[in-house]
From Swiss-Prot:
<feature type="transmembrane region" description="Helical">
    <location>
        <begin position="99"/>
        <end position="119"/>
    </location>
</feature>
<feature type="transmembrane region" description="Helical">
    <location>
        <begin position="59"/>
        <end position="79"/>
    </location>
</feature>
<feature type="transmembrane region" description="Helical">
    <location>
        <begin position="295"/>
        <end position="315"/>
    </location>
</feature>
<keyword id="KW-0472">Membrane</keyword>
<feature type="transmembrane region" description="Helical">
    <location>
        <begin position="150"/>
        <end position="170"/>
    </location>
</feature>
<feature type="transmembrane region" description="Helical">
    <location>
        <begin position="484"/>
        <end position="504"/>
    </location>
</feature>
<keyword id="KW-0934">Plastid</keyword>
<dbReference type="GO" id="GO:0008137">
    <property type="term" value="F:NADH dehydrogenase (ubiquinone) activity"/>
</dbReference>
<dbReference type="GO" id="GO:0009535">
    <property type="term" value="C:chloroplast thylakoid membrane"/>
</dbReference>
<keyword id="KW-1133">Transmembrane helix</keyword>
<feature type="transmembrane region" description="Helical">
    <location>
        <begin position="229"/>
        <end position="249"/>
    </location>
</feature>
<feature type="transmembrane region" description="Helical">
    <location>
        <begin position="418"/>
        <end position="438"/>
    </location>
</feature>
<keyword id="KW-0521">NADP</keyword>
<keyword id="KW-0520">NAD</keyword>
<keyword id="KW-0874">Quinone</keyword>
<dbReference type="Pfam" id="PF19530">
    <property type="entry name" value="Ndh2_N"/>
</dbReference>
<comment type="subunit">
    <text>NDH is composed of at least 16 different subunits, 5 of which are encoded in the nucleus.</text>
</comment>
Length: 510
């Protein structure tokens, strides 16, 4: 009899929870319509994979790409709508969040054609790969719109779990297994540190979890200047530092970049930075509003360390992927300048603009590394010597992306850095901007060193990898080269006409 009553109570409780979830989805589902498109794409992929006897690979690519493009269209369709808070305060929709969601969707859309030939050559499981990419994209989008500490913790875990699985996708590779283990351990530790910081905010604010309500709670409890806030700030900064690969929390980054499949590295190198930057901006700007001087100082120190260590260690690398890993550590240091400046001197606008350029520059570089690796089986920097003599298109496009990463005019990277540094200078961050300028010069050195190798024509320097290099006979049918062309155009032309891009970015301030 007791068991029967307990069973009925369980059924009633489950029904109430289901009805509440259905009610929220029915009335608030329109606010996450782009995310719902991705969820539908995920379900469709699973259905086709489980019911089809003969795996039709083009359909999987088509469904994934179409879902991403439709999600982008849904975001653009509701552009400039009034900010809305939905799902009982857990999710916020505004232009600031949506532009970061757009950047994440753009990254994923470019990464899928970049991965096609690699997956076919390495015989990776296509369905699982696309499922992980779409799920990670979904987690990143929810993180951009998260409005409370619980969602901010859960959404990146959705992204991180897929990232761990993607980094260890080539199970037979010892380096991939090692990279996955390091990534998993460091990611778990950083999440624990982050949630510990949120627990301090929860207690100090009187039990609030929404970002704005945390501020109100701190005012009501008079704890906004207490030592506990400093403790929470330190823990949350360390947790975000791991997610952004800021020095000295960057130790996992080079090993994960080197050991993971190259298309996975291309995907993680941009999407994780975009999602974490959006989250960091909201966390520091809202709950820590009364501690702005403290978190400005912390981020300045981390940015300086990242720019110096990232660019100096990149000089000594012999692997292209490890070099780009340390380069990305330096690049995120530049992005931090925009977060510190804030919206007073167009700091957020310059940060968003530079991240848009960084996506094209970084993905363009990785597209060339994928293509070169498939045709030669190596990613050693010295093995690129003389590539121009065999494939001028690949060598020139790689050189353009590297020069744009270094910030040479008139490429997009130069104008992005110029505006970012100018905003920092106007905000009084003279020392930080000076370090940024000096380290940019250092980065140009190791990028030019690679370009010199690409253009060399001396036979004694050309390795057997380039001597035996074979180009694809059907250039128009190569999806990687399609991504390359898009990224080269985006790395060069937009820099000349930056004003429209900056104007759009300035409209995203929350």
């Amino acid at each position: 009899m007791i068991w029967h009553v307990q069973n009925e109570n369980f059924i009633l409780d489950s029904t109430r929870i289901f009805m509440k979830a259905f009610h929220l989805l029915l009335f608030d589902g329109s606010f996450i319509f782009p995310e719902c498109i991705l969820i539908f794409g995920l379900i469709l992929l699973l259905m086709i994979d489980s019911t089809s006897d003969q795996k039709d690979r083009p359909w999987f690519y088509f469904i994934s790409s179409t879902s991403l493009v439709m999600s982008i269209a849904a975001l653009l369709f509701r552009w400039r709508e009034e900010p809305m808070i939905s799902f009982s305060g857990n999710f916020q929709t505004n232009n600031f969040n949506e532009i970061f969601q757009f950047l994440i969707l753009l990254c994923s859309t470019l990464c899928i054609p970049l991965s096609v030939e690699y997956i076919e050559c390495t015989e990776m499981a296509i369905t699982e790969f696309l499922l992980f990419v779409l799920t990670a994209t979904l987690g990143g989008m929810f993180l951009c719109g998260a409005n409370d500490s619980i969602t901010i913790f859960v959404a990146p875990e959705c992204f991180s779990l897929c990232s761990y699985l993607l980094s260890g996708y080539t199970k037979r590779d010892v380096r991939s297994n090692e990279a996955t283990m390091k990534y998993l351990l460091m990611g778990g530790a950083s999440s624990s540190i982050l949630v510990h910081g949120f627990s301090w905010l929860y207690g100090l604010s009187g039990g609030e979890i929404e970002l704005q309500e945390i501020v109100n709670g701190l005012i009501n409890t008079q704890m906004y200047n207490s030592p506990g806030i400093s403790i929470a700030l330190i823990f949350i900064t360390v947790g975000i530092g791991f997610k952004l690969s800021l020095a000295p929390f960057h130790q996992w980054t080079p090993d994960v970049y080197e050991g993971s499949p190259t298309p996975v590295v291309a995907f993680l190198s941009v999407t994780s930075k975009v999602a974490a930057s959006a989250s960091a901006t909201r966390i520091f700007d809202i709950p820590f509003y009364f501690s702005s001087n403290e978190w400005h100082l912390l981020l300045e120190i981390l940015a300086i360390l990242s720019m110096i260590l990232g660019n100096l260690i990149a000089i000594t690398q012999t692997s292209m992927k490890r070099m780009l890993a340390y380069s990305s550590i330096g690049q995120i240091g530049y992005v931090i300048i925009g977060i510190i400046v804030g919206d007073s001197n167009d700091g957020y606008a310059s940060m968003i603009t530079y991240m848009l350029f960084y996506i094209s520059m970084n993905l363009g570089t990785f597209a060339r590394i994928v293509l070169f690796g498939l045709r030669t089986g190596t990613d050693n920097i010295r093995d690129y010597a003389g590539l121009y003599t065999k494939d001028p298109f690949l060598a020139l496009s790689l050189a353009l992306c590297l020069l744009s990463l270094g910030g040479l005019p008139p490429l997009a990277g130069f104008f992005g850095k110029l505006h970012l540094f100018w905003c920092g200078w106007q905000a009084g961050l003279y020392f930080l901007v000076s370090i940024g300028l000096l380290t940019s010069v250092v980065s140009i050195y190791y990028y030019l060193k690679i370009i010199k190798l690409l253009m060399t024509g001396r036979n004694q320097e050309i390795t057997p990898h380039v001597r035996n290099y074979r180009r694809s006979p059907l250039r128009s049918n190569n999806s990687i080269e399609l991504s390359m062309i898009v990224c080269v155009i985006a790395s060069t032309i937009p820099g000349i006409s930056m004003n429209p891009i900056l104007a759009i970015a300035q409209d995203t301030l929350f």
